[in-house]
A protein has these predicted regions:
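Short loop/edge segments at beta-strand edges and connector loops
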Residues: 31, 84, 118-120, 168-170, ...
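Helical element adjacent to the flavin cofactor pocket in flavoenzyme catalytic cores
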Residues: 138-195
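Dinucleotide-binding Rossmann-like beta1-alpha1 core, especially the glycine-rich loop
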Residues: 46-126, 135, 244
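Glycine-rich FAD pyrophosphate-binding loop
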Residues: 21-43
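Flavin-dependent oxidoreductases
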Residues: 15, 175-244
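Conserved Rossmann-like nucleotide-cofactor binding loop
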Residues: 12, 35, 203
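Redox-cofactor binding/interface segments in oxidoreductases and associated redox assembly factors
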Residues: 7, 50, 198-199
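N-terminal Rossmann-like FAD-binding beta1-loop-alpha1 element of flavoenzymes
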Residues: 2-29
């Protein structure tokens, strides 16, 4: 019986694999695609959130802040691209200033460091191409972006070097409890493990409902569009910019 099976080789699965590789354990990662970072992790904005918008007291709030603090050291250790560009939440109307203040107070309560509300002149100095309608912004210097591919590959490579096994082109079909652990049935056979980590991205609810049908959950996925610009446009926007 395997000690741990991780389902999904995206950034969450590969990061979990790397962390668990610190211990004496037999760890297997199952991935339905042909390589790591082929699902949700390959198609996202790669933002390291500062943690100002997560509801205070939630696990997301705590992990946003903790993850943001840990990211620079991880990037140096594993040699993946990390840009501490900071983030701005831009306010376009005077009547929305109280919302900006609430966001600042929520972030401060969450422990986000360096938060400030800046006015038009400072905002224009930081982002010369920002809309003339912008009147203020919440500045979060701990916000950043990473390369999602490089980060995921770095986690996976480090995990593999420390004994974690990866099996690709293996789609999980069933997960259910057995004596002393769990059975994971796939299109390439069955695997038993003492523990299972569900890191299946937008399909994590499907696996959860297999394992715990009495406590069903549903992930409501969202899809966005990306515009690929020429590299000469790289300085047009200097920070991660959100609209309030």
């Amino acid at each position: 019986m395997t000690d741990v099976i991780i389902i999904g080789a995206g950034v969450s699965g590969c990061a979990s694999a790397r962390e668990l590789a610190r211990y004496k354990a037999d760890i297997l990662v199952l991935e339905k695609e042909e390589d790591v970072c082929c699902g949700t992790s390959k198609a996202n904005s790669a933002i390291v959130h500062a943690g100002f918008d997560a509801a205070h007291g939630t696990l997301m709030a705590r992990l946003n802040v903790e993850g943001s603090k840990r990211m620079p050291a991880l990037a140096r250790e594993l040699d993946f691209a990390y840009d501490p560009c900071g983030s701005l939440v831009v306010c376009l109307q005077e009547e929305d200033l109280p919302k900006l203040q609430q966001l600042y107070e929520n972030g401060t309560a969450n422990g986000v460091e360096g938060l400030r509300i800046i006015r038009r002149d400072e905002l224009k100095a930081m982002e010369p191409n920002i809309s003339d309608d912008a009147i203020a912004a919440l500045w979060a210097p701990t916000g950043a972006i990473v390369c999602p591919f490089g980060m995921t590959y770095a986690f996976a490579e480090n995990a593999a070097k420390n004994g974690v096994r990866f099996q690709f082109d293996t789609a999980v079909q069933k997960v259910y409890p057995i004596q002393g652990g769990w059975r994971v049935e796939t299109d390439r056979g069955s695997y038993d493990a003492r523990l299972v980590v569900n890191a299946a991205g937008v399909y994590a609810d499907v696996l959860h409902n297999m394992a715990a049908p009495a406590q069903p959950m549903q992930i409501i996925a969202r899809r966005g569009d990306y515009f690929l610009l020429d590299h000469t446009a790289g300085d047009h926007v200097r920070h991660t910019v959100f609209q309030l």
